[in-house]
Amino acid sequence: MSILEKVQPIETMLPERYYTMSTEDMEKRVREIKEKMGETLFIPGHHYQKDEVVQFSDAAGDSLQLAQVAASNKEAKYIVFCGVHFMAETADMLTTDEQVVILPDMRAGCSMADMADIEQTERAWEELTKLFGDTMIPLTYVNSTAAIKAFCGRNGGATVTSSNAKQMVSWAFTQKERLVFLPDQHLGRNTAYDLGIPLDKMAVWDPHTDSLEYDGDIEEIQVILWKGHCSVHQNFTVKNIENVRKNHPDMNIIVHPECCYEVVAASDYAGSTKYIIDMIESAPSGSKWAIGTEMNLVNRIIQQHPDKEIVSLNPFMCPCLTMNRIDLPHLLWALETIERGEEINVISVDKQVTEEAVLALNRMLERV
């Protein structure tokens, strides 16, 4: 047992017996419980999950899509969310009070979501208001905590996804002169630049120094980017692209917009997870692709398209480590606990936070 497991609250510790069970036995038990529970159990699985987990998901998709699908399954009393913490929070906020959302491993967080906590954000908003007055509107990527979504909700802002970021940023500028984009600076920068906003009219707020970083005239700043990033997509570099161009000049390069501006600019295509999946799906047989996104998804795409030559843009990439905490043993543990009439790792968002966060979510859903 690791030190991390020893210091966890007892309800989040995986019992020892799951470490000794065979994969075959665990898979058999998951199937038995799924069959027994029927429609009262719903298992959403994020695209970045391991195959050992995704094989049992009732729906696969991105975070918001899965939360919406979970909310539409009114028959399901238990939603065992195979993703990370902020995704389970969103599912809890969109489902009914009678439905129970469970995260198989409470350590499955998101480093990017954790880069913007509510205290830092409230402090930043206060300081930025001193500089810019009532000229700002906040937008947050759905990859953020419920508290940050709620902050945006009560301040007239909204959430965005990587698929609809352009639409939502365009909307934001019909509301206010300036935009504060949380927590992923890269998605914010790439989206704003794609809409014609020059880089020198963007600034970065550093929550650790409580300072605004910018190159141009402060009065001309239109976009304030939170200094956060995805730890996975940050690892794709221009050097990776140069190596592909040199060794495979006929290979298409497609990346997620959570990659930095320089990588997106040097790629052939950039878009959401769904965009990447659809692009490869519709590509002709024999086409060649280097993909800049999470490794579990890249490997799954490779398996699904043996007629195409597909590689990771960075050959030394690792999967998302926090997403990978959800594994077959933790999934089975969650299901067997439910089968016994018990509940572990329940995700429950405060009522007021939920109300304000849903405001932000609905402002997005009404416009896309």
Swiss-Prot record:
Binds 1 [4Fe-4S] cluster per subunit. GO terms for cellular component: cytosol. One of its GO terms (biological process) is 'de novo' NAD biosynthetic process from L-aspartate. GO terms for molecular function: 4 iron, 4 sulfur cluster binding; metal ion binding; quinolinate synthetase A activity. Its cofactor is [4Fe-4S] cluster. It catalyses: iminosuccinate + dihydroxyacetone phosphate = quinolinate + phosphate + 2 H2O + H(+). Its main location: cytoplasm. Its EC number is 2.5.1.72. Belongs to the quinolinate synthase family. Type 3 subfamily. This is Quinolinate synthase. It comes from Bacillus anthracis. The lineage of its organism: Bacteria, Bacillati, Bacillota, Bacilli, Bacillales. The gene is nadA.
